[in-house]
Amino acid sequence: MIKNLSEQTASFGLCPPRCYYVPFGGAQKEGAREDSERFVSLNGTWKFRAHEKLADIGEDFCSEVLPDEIPVPSCVQYFGYDSFQYTNVTYPFPYDPPFVPVKNPAFHYSRNFEADGQGRLYIVFEGVDSCFYIYVNGKFVGFSEISHRLAEFDITSFVRPGENRLDVVVQKWCAGSYLEDQDKWRFTGIFRDVYLLKRPEGHIVDYKIEPRLLEDGSAELLFFHRGGGEA
């Protein structure tokens, strides 16, 4: 059974925040991110199963053969797995922060991916509503509940050379939903891109470019970075 982390923390296992970029190989010319040899899209058709609540997901869910399919990115409501819901000034569930209803729909996604076992491997979710749990080869990697935040996980220690299994469980509501009471339709699922980033062991993680105007009227451009090695 998956332990509900939503009432305890906003995230677990996430990489520290960084500026947004997709790395390219040293010999590559920069371009669209899909052209990078270090970018692997996981968009497409995933295996899928809908549950009425998190507790309905069994102990061996990471080895389960899921009966349905769903495109990623998308929202589950468009495929009949949950009802469309619109609210503006009222909450879409009983107000009792940080708690949400026990009968809180949960959606299990799964797919396989290949890894070469070289360097470091990261997985990036650009948007999941509302919270989600990620497992690689049956092992818990992490959790995030800020729907529109990019969530990046280092999965190097969880993968093996060859085929690997990825399982993601998404809940409709979480504690973070109390901060998202906006005038909008309520949609659920992996609604933005998912991809892998392949990096060498030593690499730039984060950077900052800072322009400065000097007293003599000239300017300088400073480059700060975290991490090192091949960019």
What are these regions (language model features)?
Residues 41-44, 128, 228-230:
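A short, compositionally biased
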Residues 121, 134-136, 217-231:
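Beta-strand-rich binding/interaction modules
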Residues 211-217:
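Short, solvent-exposed loop/linker segments at the N-terminal edge
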Residues 1-12, 28, 32-33, 47-51, ...:
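Accessory beta-strand-rich segments of carbohydrate-active enzymes
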Residues 1-88, 169, 196:
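Accessory carbohydrate-binding/adhesion or oligomerization-edge regions at the termini
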Residues 84-99:
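Surface-exposed, low-complexity/disordered Ser/Thr/Gly/Pro/Asn-rich loops and linkers
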